[in-house]
Curated annotation (Swiss-Prot):
Organism: Psychrobacter arcticus (strain DSM 17307 / VKM B-2377 / 273-4)
CDD domains xrefs: LipB
Protein's recorded name: Octanoyltransferase
Binding site for substrate: 89-96, 190-192, 203-205
Function: Catalyzes the transfer of endogenously produced octanoic acid from octanoyl-acyl-carrier-protein onto the lipoyl domains of lipoate-dependent enzymes. Lipoyl-ACP can also act as a substrate although octanoyl-ACP is likely to be the physiological substrate.
Keywords, comma-separated and alphabetical: Acyltransferase, Cytoplasm, Transferase
Principal location class: cytoplasm
Amino acid sequence: MPNTMQALNTQPLNDTLITKSITAADYVPTLDAMLSRTLARIALKKEQGLRTPDELWIVDHNDVYTLGQAGKEEHILQRTNTPIIKTDRGGQVTWHGHGQLVMYWLFDLDSVGWSVRNMVSHAEQAIEDVVNDCLKSPASTDTIHISARARRDAPGVYIYADTAAEIDSAHRSTDEIKVDNTIMIGKIASLGFKIKHGFSYHGVAINLNCDLSAFNAINPCGYAGMQMLRLADFVNMNQATTPQPNNPTLTDDAKTITYEQFTQKLIDNIAQRHAGVIPLRELAPK
């Protein structure tokens, strides 16, 4: 069945950012559509001087493993029936599938006034903001005092726990990094972008309530032993792993968080960053 693309119900803070949604998306047609749209925007700017609205694509992918430009076959540990696609984004190997929120950033970096480093940091900090809001909400089941944060030495968003807390083996990475009396226990979000003539595409993937066993067949992002985590490990989440219509917005007293509520909250944060309302914080320590 072909992908279906539709406008997502959102109200960004300016008219220079459009959001679109694709459900049950096969990877190759989605990549082709991203590249086609990016090339068209580049041509309009170069040939006619036209600036087109930036686009944020919210994607629910069918199962797929993708290899970035730095991807090595040795990081694929098991061959399964899941397709393996080589792609032009940055980074190594990762998995996409239902229950994971993928957001593709089709941005004109010159128009928004960002460097590539700015964009990566905005993406990481937006995810940090929303994950940490969820961890502090009544829906949280956290008992080990965790928080989400980025690292300077490895793109993405990671979960850190207070070193004084009792951390079981299910929540402990073999690649432990200690920062400010906390210990990194795993990764919840991955990033991989491609820049072409100042325009970005590809983006971020956040594990919400997906089946993490798919990561067992790979070294996620090229890191052997990296523990992949999901929001549902620490927050009460609705069990639906694909977008559901007519879910209310996330409220401060919500005891359960849905895929759509998290998505909307993240869209709002990104839209405010795109509009210059939310500035970058100081970069995370190494």
